[in-house]
Amino acid sequence: MDFLSVFGIRGRSKEVHRLDDAMRAVGLPPKLVPDSVKLTVLNLLKDAEGGVLADVDASCARAAPMLAYCVLGSEEFSEANGPDATLAIEARLHHAIEIGESLDARFAMLTLLAKVTQPKVIERFDLRLG
C-alpha cells in the first residue's frame, strides 16, 4: 500500500478493496467497518507474514470471518455463513482468547477498540480492554 493511497489521493488501495470483497463474502457489509480498522487489519496481516502479503486474497479471507463474527454477532454471522462456519469461528475466538497474542486475538481487540464489536459478542466472550 503506498503512502498516497492511505490518504485517498490515489483512491483506495487494491488491498482494501480485496478486504472489502472478503468481508462481503462472509456477510459483513464493508461500510460497517471503519477504514482505520481495515488499514490496521492489513498491517497486522503484513506483520504476520513478514512485511509482505504474498497472497492478498487468502490473507483477507482468513481475517474476514473473525471481523464479521465480532461485528455482526453470532446470529447474523450464522445466517450468512451457516452453523458449521459459526462453530468454527467461535472455536477460533475461544482459542484466540486463551492464547492472547494471536492474530485472531488482535482482530477481536481491534474491533473492540474501534467500538464496532456486537454487544452480545462482548458479553458472551467477556471481551474487555486491559
Language model: regions and residue ranges:
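Short terminal alpha-helical segments
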Residues: 8-57
